[in-house]
Design a protein with these regions (language model features):
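Conserved N-terminal subdomain of the carbohydrate kinase-like
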Residues: 2-122, 126-129
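Intrinsic structural disorder
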Residues: 1-2, 14, 37, 158-162, ...
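Conserved phosphate/ATP/ADP-binding segment of small-molecule kinases
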Residues: 133-210
Length: 210
């Protein structure tokens, strides 16, 4: 087992700074990401952006958005321990406020300044086809204009890909070629890799998802 602060690491281990939500009920954000990544051998350092009872797609929830200043303090404390220079990947998900988004981007800059080979993977959480948009209305344009252009990898679902690019708006089940065109449009925004999740397209049976 590799311990925080020790110089050695296991073969293939990636050290991940995961800045995401945490929920008590269900599995999203850090509540979904941390254990699986640890289980396959990676070192994950979670920083929570919200502490919610459940994810906001339910329409009602309780618990606080962590103040952006507090998220920043946690990251600065890690920087003071020399941890940011060890980070290989910054992973971000649900961003509870525009202020937290700014803190995430600052963390990405700090990590890349300390480790020039580090990457940033952004899950641009905005909503889904069933629930529509369930984030602060200020978040989608911020993701589109500031966050996604600075990401190396993005992992939108089909709804989020359409929201980012303005494409895929006319059909709930577009052709696969249209989805690939939207992914190309997203790559043109900045990230080199676009991984689209929860795809439902016209070329597949209606009772399946990809």
């Amino acid at each position: 087992m590799v311990r925080l602060g020790r110089p050695g690491r296991q073969t293939g281990e990636v050290r991940i700074l995961s800045i995401q939500s945490s929920v008590a009920y269900g599995h999203v954000g850090n509540s979904a990401a941390v254990f699986p990544l640890q289980r396959i051998g990676h070192e994950v350092w979670p920083v929570h952006t919200v502490l919610f009872s459940n994810h906001t797609g339910y329409g009602a929830w309780r618990g606080p958005v962590v103040a952006a200043a507090d998220v920043r303090e946690v990251i600065l404390g890690m920087e003071e321990r020399g941890a940011l220079a060890q980070v290989d990947l910054v992973l971000s998900g649900y961003q509870g406020s525009p202020e937290i988004a700014a803190v995430v981007l600052d963390a990405v800059e700090r990590v890349k300044a300390a480790n020039g080979s580090a990457s940033y993977a952004c899950d641009p959480v905005m909503g889904n086809a069933d629930s529509g948009c369930f984030v602060d209305p200020a978040i989608p344009p911020l993701l589109r204009e500031q966050v996604v252009p600075r990401a190396d990898v993005i992992t939108p679902n089909q709804f989020e890909l359409g929201s980012l690019t303005g494409l895929l708006q006319d059909s709930a089940r577009p052709r696969i070629a249209e989805i690939l065109d939207a992914a190309d449009a997203a790559r043109a925004m900045g990230p080199s890799t676009v991984l689209v999740t929860s795809v439902a397209h016209a070329d597949q049976p209606e009772d399946t998802i990809e």
